[in-house]
Amino acid sequence: MSLSFSENTLISTSQPMSQPTIPPSMTSSLPIIISFDGNIGSGKSTKVKDIEKYYQEQGRTDILFIQEPVDEWNSIVDEKGVTILSNYYKDQKRFAFRLQMLAYISRLALLRRASKMGYKYIITERCVGTDRNVFSKMLYDKGDIEHDEYTIYKKWYDEFIIDVPIGAIVYIKASPEVCLERVNIRAREGENIPLEYLKECDKYHDEWIDGETIPKLIINADIDLNKNPEEKLEILKQFDTFI
C-alpha cells in the first residue's frame, strides 16, 4: 500500500515490530520514529527499501515508511527552471538558508501528518534532527548561514520538535570516498558534490550521533550489499534484534 502526501512524495506501509526502548520524553500517543541517517550516497534509501520489503514479506501492517522528499525539493525551481538543489551546490552561501528551511518544512510536514495516521512505528529516511544537527549546523559553522538566519531556523525547530520526537537512530556509516563513488554512479540531477563536502558531512554526522542518548544501531555501509547477500541478511537480522 502506498500513500501520497504530496505530488511526488510516497509513503508506503508495512507491519508491527516489537517495541524498542522509548525515551521518557515520548508520549504513548505518538508513534515511535526510527530515523535512518547517514551521509549523502551512504545507501540509506537502499537499506530502507530492503527493510520495507523484509517486513512486507512478513505481512506486517503497522509500520509506515517515509522516503526523503527529494522530488519535492526538485520541484522548487527559479525563474530559469533551475532546481534549488542545483543552485545550492553551485552557490552554497546564497542558497543555504532557503534550502535548509525547505528541507525542514517538507520533512516536518510529512512526519506530522504521518504521526496522526495511527501507525505504531514510522521509519524515515533522515529526520528533522538530521537537518538541525548536521546540515544546518555545518552551514552555520562555515558562515554560509548567517547568525540571524540560524536563530530563525532554531526557533522553528524548537517549536515543532515535540510533535515528531525521534525514538531511535540507524546510522548507515560509509566512508566519504565510497559515498562519492556512489553519488557519481547514480548521477542525480543537481548532485555535483565535492569530496570535501562529504567529509564535512561525515564529521557532523559522527559528532551528532555520538552525542545522542537514544538507542542507536551503526551499520557498516562500505560493503556493496548487491554483491554480498549474506551481509544484507545479517543487517536485516541486526535491525530485528535492535528493534
Give the role of each language-model region:
Residues 44:
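Conserved lysine of the Walker
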Residues 40:
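The conserved Walker
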